[in-house]
Amino acid sequence: MRNSRFLLAATLLPIFLIPSSFAAQRLSENERALFDAANRERGAKSLPALQWDEALAVAARKHANRMAFYNLVEHQLSGEPDLEGRLTLAGARFSIIAENIAVASNSETIHAGWMDSPGHRRNILNPNLTAVGIAAVRGAAGSSPCRIFRCPSRS
C-alpha cells in the first residue's frame, strides 16, 4: 500500500510542476509560429516576451472559427459581441486590449503583413500589452488567424 501511494505521488508530481506556459506548447504549427514571431520582434526591441493567456486563446479560437466559417476577415462579425464582450465571455480580465486578424496561406505571410501595417505592428510592440492568445483556423481562403493581446486588469 505504501509503495502504491508513493507511485501515485510520483506520477502526479510532474503535473504540478508543469509551467503555466504549458498551454502555449499545445499550439498548432501556425499558432506557435505567430507566437514565436511576435516574441522575436519584441526581443529585438528589448521588450519583454508576451505570456500565453488561455482565456484570450479561447476568445481568439471562437472568432477565428467564425471568420473561417463565414469566409470573412472582420473584427466583429454579425451577431457576435465586440472584442471587449468576447473577452469578458471568455473570462479574461483586462485594462487594455488589442486584436490582429488576417487571412493568408501561411504564418510567415501573415506576420510580415502585420509588421508592415503600422497599427498591427504597434499592437505587437506595445510594451503595455503583456499577454496574448492566438488561434489560426484553416478556411477556404487560407489560414484565418486571430491574435488578441491584453494588459492585465489592475483590479
Which positions does each model-derived feature cover?
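A well-ordered secondary-structure block
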Residues: 82-154
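Sec/Tat signal peptide C-region and signal peptidase I cleavage site
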Residues: 19-23
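Bacterial N-terminal signal peptides
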Residues: 9-18
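Short, well-ordered surface patches within globular domains
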Residues: 24-87, 127-128, 132
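Bacterial N-terminal signal peptides that target proteins for export
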Residues: 1-10
